[in-house]
């Protein structure tokens, strides 16, 4: 079968931004969005019809309830657009605040109309009560992290599966920053670091306005921290060529160990991918727990041949089972059963149900 071209793979990775296009399937693939928005729309129609009927009668109608009706329909339209553009995680806090305001509005309108007599006011009050219930459900969902039990249970019914958790990712990065990385071949690695300059840890993307040293307190200690860019050129180190360097005496070994020179994972955006990865994808680190770096299991849908000029890509066969992590971008970091690590195109694999254990 036809394989992806190296130029196409590089072109995809050169753009660190994910394009969001209007796609109705993103909305239709989420049962929670369809169900809640459908019920909210029906409730809104009931509230609108009841309010018009009450206002047309002799009974005085609270004018603020009209703004409640307008605000609620604008909120539903916004949610529909956000789902179609797949921007829910980007505007989660805004949605939570907007829904919280809507909950206050609908609750106030309910309190103003529910005590009116007649079927017309009863219909309007029922519509506002249903809208208040839907708004409360939205506050619980959008106000919670994707890793929360309620969100994970709700997202499990979605065709796209459970959404990635920013909280879990940040916690994993924080844990990994407290654990020193131990290279597989420390003696040659230490020798290479002596001849390498140690730049300050910084974000590669200057457009974000982040510069300077992010970890100044740590850099002032005796332990040296190396940016992932220092490792460029070392990724294809031949095992056989490094074996002679392992023949050193115990004194040199003690000296190297006492220097405590290591690489700590840095939260930096790799220029070759559109995902945030530390320590050059974390491919040359042993942070103690493999599940932190490769928590998911994926199956290869097609055969992929890695670009020989790209040191980070790995090849795999159709049907091969891989351990993957950082699954938010087009390129995922992966580990094969033979221990080989690298990056793979996400459209060539599919995630299996559940996390790896």
Curated annotation (Swiss-Prot):
For this UniProt record, the keywords arranged alphabetically read as follows: Cell membrane, Membrane, SH3 domain, Stress response, Transmembrane, Transmembrane helix
InterPro entries for the chain? SH3-like_dom_sf, SH3_domain, Sho1_SH3
Q: Kindly list the GO CC terms recorded for this protein.
A: plasma membrane
Membrane topology type, per the record?
A: Multi-pass membrane protein
Residue intervals annotated with topology Cytoplasmic = 1-31, 85-93, 143-357
Instruction: Tell me where in or outside the cell this protein is found.
Output: Cell membrane
Q: Signal peptide: which range, if any?
A: none
Extracellular side stretches = 53-63, 115-121
The primary site where this protein sits is membrane
SH3 domain location, by residue?
Answer: 293-354
Lineage: superkingdom: Eukaryota
Self-association or partners: how does it assemble? Forms homooligomers.
What protein family does this chain belong to?
Answer: Belongs to the SHO1 family.
Q: What is this protein called?
A: High osmolarity signaling protein SHO1
Source gene? Answer: SHO1
């Amino acid at each position: 079968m036809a394989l992806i071209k190296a130029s196409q793979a590089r072109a995809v990775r050169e753009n660190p931004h994910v394009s969001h296009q209007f796609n109705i399937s993103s909305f239709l693939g989420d049962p929670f969005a369809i169900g809640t928005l459908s019920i909210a729309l029906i409730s809104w129609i009931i509230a609108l019809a009841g309010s018009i009927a009450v206002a047309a009668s002799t009974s005085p109608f609270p004018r603020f309830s009209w703004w409640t009706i307008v605000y609620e329909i604008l909120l539903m339209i916004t949610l529909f657009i956000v789902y179609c553009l797949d921007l829910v995680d980007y505007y989660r806090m805004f949605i939570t605040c907007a829904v919280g305001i809507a909950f206050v509005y609908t609750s106030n309108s309910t309190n103003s109309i529910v005590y009116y007599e007649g079927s017309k006011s009863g219909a309007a009050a029922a519509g506002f009560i249903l809208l208040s219930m839907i708004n409360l459900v939205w506050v619980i969902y959008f106000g919670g992290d994707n890793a929360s039990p309620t969100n994970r249970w709700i997202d499990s019914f979605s065709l796209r599966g459970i959404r990635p958790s920013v909280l879990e990712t940040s916690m994993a990065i924080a844990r990994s920053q407290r654990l020193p990385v131990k290279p597989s071949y420390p003696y040659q690695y230490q020798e290479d670091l002596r001849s390498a300059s140690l730049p300050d840890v910084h974000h590669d993307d200057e457009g974000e306005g982040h510069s300077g040293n992010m970890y100044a307190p740590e850099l002032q200690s005796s332990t040296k921290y190396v940016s992932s860019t220092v490792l460029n050129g070392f990724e294809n180190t031949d095992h056989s060529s490094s074996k002679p360097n392992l023949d050193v005496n115990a004194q040199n070994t003690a000296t190297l160990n006492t220097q405590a020179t290591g690489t700590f994972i840095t939260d930096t955006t790799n220029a070759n991918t559109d995902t945030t990865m530390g320590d050059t994808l974390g491919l040359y680190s042993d942070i103690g727990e493999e599940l932190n770096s490769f928590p998911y299991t994926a199956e290869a849908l097609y055969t992929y041949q890695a670009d020989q000029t790209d040191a980070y890509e790995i090849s795999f066969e159709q049907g091969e089972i891989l351990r993957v992590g950082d699954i938010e971008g087009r390129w995922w970091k992966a580990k094969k059963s033979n221990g080989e690590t690298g990056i793979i195109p996400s459209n060539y694999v599919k995630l299996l149900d559940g996390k790896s254990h």
